[in-house]
């Protein structure tokens, strides 16, 4: 199964970001806490190589808490400032401004020595589609100043947001990268909803996900859907279809409906706290 989605507006957005980065002190990179590495656009490291860096692991409420601690330690070891948060409920948001100031303290001190007072830190908010950038900005600013949606690619244009006297944010559209070298990365991005469902084979996606769950989170499927995990994957998904009344007009199990249900339950957190990858220590 090949995963790829790179519409033309992403090329244009990347060029604009390369231009805008000259105005920026800090790059705030949002990642999905369920796939902290796979949801990092590898182009961002090059884009922000001479800037202060902050990684926000969003949707931490949906992720495996132990894995989130491991990933936080992993990124800190790489030299990033890191915060785990849930932008929707504002959990973890209170510390953001203090951490932005801490990350940029050299710049603030440099300004002070040059007699420049109260110049706000200018931060660019970046991330792939559907990691929650707009929701984060709205929660941080306290008003709906960025468009939000649960479909990848809602934020299209450039917009500056003045948060307070200390911080200005530049929101950017979510961009992927032209080619996934590792298709496992594409699989994970598809599972969290960063690739449009319309171009995916949802049946095959569910097979790969169920295979992962049986290996890494045994018992979750049995607990949620009252099915036997001893069954092979196709039988298991068919059993979910029967138990959850995902049936065709003739009363047969509707495999595709059950596959979509399992993926939706993962995305919404109904399956439990799940992280799809671990840091290599």
Q: Residue ranges of each PLM-predicted region?
A:
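Helix-rich effector regions associated with P-loop NTPase G domains
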Residues: 1-26, 34-43, 47-53, 81, ...
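Anionic group-transfer/hydrolysis microenvironments
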Residues: 31-34, 60, 140, 173
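Canonical P-loop GTPase G-domain recognition
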Residues: 61-127, 145, 246-247, 253
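Short, structured loop/turn "capping" segments at alpha-beta junctions
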Residues: 107-111, 138, 144-150, 216-220
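Glycine-rich phosphate-binding P-loop
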Residues: 122-142, 146, 172
């Amino acid at each position: 199964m090949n995963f790829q989605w790179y519409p033309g507006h992403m090329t244009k957005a990347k060029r604009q970001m390369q231009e805008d980065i000259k105005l920026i002190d800090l790059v705030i990179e949002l990642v999905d806490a369920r796939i902290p590495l796979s949801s990092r656009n590898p182009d961002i490291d090059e884009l922000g190589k001479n800037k202060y860096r902050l990684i926000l692991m969003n949707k931490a409420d949906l992720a495996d808490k132990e894995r989130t601690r491991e990933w936080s330690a992993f990124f800190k070891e790489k030299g990033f400032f890191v915060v785990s948060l849930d932008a929707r409920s504002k959990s973890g948001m209170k510390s953001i401004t203090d951490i932005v100031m801490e990350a940029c303290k050299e710049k603030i001190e440099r300004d002070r020595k040059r007699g420049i007072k109260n110049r706000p830190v200018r931060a660019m908010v970046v991330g792939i589609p559907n990691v929650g950038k707009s929701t984060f900005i709205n929660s941080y600013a306290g008003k709906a100043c960025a468009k939000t949606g649960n479909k990848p690619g809602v934020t299209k244009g450039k917009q500056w947001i003045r948060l307070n006297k200390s911080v200005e944010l530049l929101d950017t559209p979510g961009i992927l990268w032209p080619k996934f070298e590792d298709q496992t990365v594409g699989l994970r991005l598809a599972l969290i909803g960063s690739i449009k469902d319309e171009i995916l084979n949802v049946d095959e996606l569910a097979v790969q996900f169920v295979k992962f769950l049986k290996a890494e989170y045994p018992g979750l499927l049995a607990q949620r859907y009252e099915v036997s995990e001893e069954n092979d994957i196709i039988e298991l998904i068919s059993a979910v279809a029967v138990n959850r009344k995902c049936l065709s007009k003739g009363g047969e199990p509707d495999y595709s409906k059950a596959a979509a249900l399992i993926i939706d339950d993962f995305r919404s957190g109904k399956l439990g706290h799940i992280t799809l990858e671990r840091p290599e220590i």
